[in-house]
């Protein structure tokens, strides 16, 4: 039978967790999602390495990831003279959550050589914006990354005001859907499954970093093919 169960720690006192404890299970908490830098999240592979008695292999994988990440970060520092501005994400139920310099995505953007409105803010959380405030501060952003849309038409269907952004007008809109799973149900409809951006992307932030660099400064990585990212048609 099961002797231990791994959970993400959102609320250790929730009813489900209490039931697991009453059943005598040992609970292990994966706290990777709470880390605020890409390499700190990736380093959780060492936790799994220790659990599976593969610590040396886990350490080796992480050291390679770290080496590659720092290499591309340095490439940007050495090569980028004029940084491009970037907008990320999309409005959700009237609110747009945007990264600061102290968030996971914010750190990736800075390391890729991007600038954004909150890039000097050190709050350890994404900040809520109204659409109007996003438009005020990001209307002229060079690139829009992580759009929640499969194409530009869907982006307009979600909110016609999205056409007001410079990145929309200049065809610099991108999503993270390249490795998203979709299924067709028996009625012929499309069901959206998981997105490998939130799985492999956590373990391999160097790939996410390269995607962002490629979008911002394609000449820096001429042979690189986008891994998680797609340009909206």
Listing of model-derived features with the role each one plays in the protein:
Residues 195-211, 215-216:
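Flexible loop/turn connectors
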Residues 207, 216-233:
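Extracellular/periplasmic juxtamembrane helices and adjacent flexible linkers that interface
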